[in-house]
């Protein structure tokens, strides 16, 4: 049965839910096969969340991701949790963030991979025992506002985890571009009103290939919004990278 569970389409929630129901009923062999077939998905998810290449199946990161995937299987409820792979992504993300907080090795994980408030909210939503709990979860108003602003640009918090730059120099360059936009009232107004980066104005202020801006549009927009927001924790995180760049520059 190897390969049976690989490359499941997002709309294939029903068949996956049936498999998971059998597993939760005690079919341990099926569970082993399901986990084995999803190892590439687990590795890819860990790599995307941490912004690193995870190819060593004996690594601590992989062990945490594997345990989290197993946890997602055990706790999944098709009636409340929707698509299993979306659910498992959040569980893996939450467990990895717990690891990050304990391990200085990952101090340079990108800021959008470390939105703790969002992680807690996601996990509480997905793991709540009753749908009525959804309405009881309190979310910081500034984060809600930030998420709404991102949605206007077609960007989600998960998009930022996947699209954030992995290298320090790239990150500093993109933050510099975002700072140029945020500090210029005219450019920022165009960004907010027209929902695109004012390319001509940006290129007149900094020497950079326009393709670099296009490829990293989501990150630049998000940082620009943060710099003009009241998101003090995230703003401080961004400003910390700016200070570090100036110190080492």
Swiss-Prot record:
Q: Does the keyword ATP-binding apply?
A: no
**What pairs make up the disulfide bonds?**
none
Primary subcellular site in the record, as a coarse category: cytoplasm
Looking up InterPro entries in the UniProt record yields: RNA_pol_sigma-I, RNA_pol_sigma70_r2, RNA_pol_sigma_r2
Task: Give the matching Pfam families.
Answer: Sigma70_r2
* Location of the motif Polymerase core binding: 60-73
Q: Which GO terms describe its cellular component?
A: cytoplasm
Per UniProt, subcellular location reads as: Cytoplasm
Single GO biological process annotation from the record: DNA-templated transcription initiation
Q: Which residues bind DNA?
A: 199-218
**Which terms in the Gene Ontology molecular function aspect does this entry carry?**
DNA binding; sigma factor activity
| Activity regulation remarks | Negatively regulated by the anti-sigma-I factor RsgI3. Binding of the polysaccharide substrate to RsgI3 may lead to the release and activation of SigI3.
**What family does the Swiss-Prot or TrEMBL record give for this protein?**
Belongs to the sigma-70 factor family. SigI subfamily.
Question: How is this protein organized at the quaternary level?
Answer: Interacts with RsgI3.
Specify the protein name: RNA polymerase sigma factor SigI3
Q: Which organism is it from?
A: Acetivibrio thermocellus (strain ATCC 27405 / DSM 1237 / JCM 9322 / NBRC 103400 / NCIMB 10682 / NRRL B-4536 / VPI 7372)
Q: Lineage in the entry? A: Bacteria, Bacillati, Bacillota, Clostridia, Eubacteriales
Q: What gene, per UniProt, encodes this protein?
A: sigI3
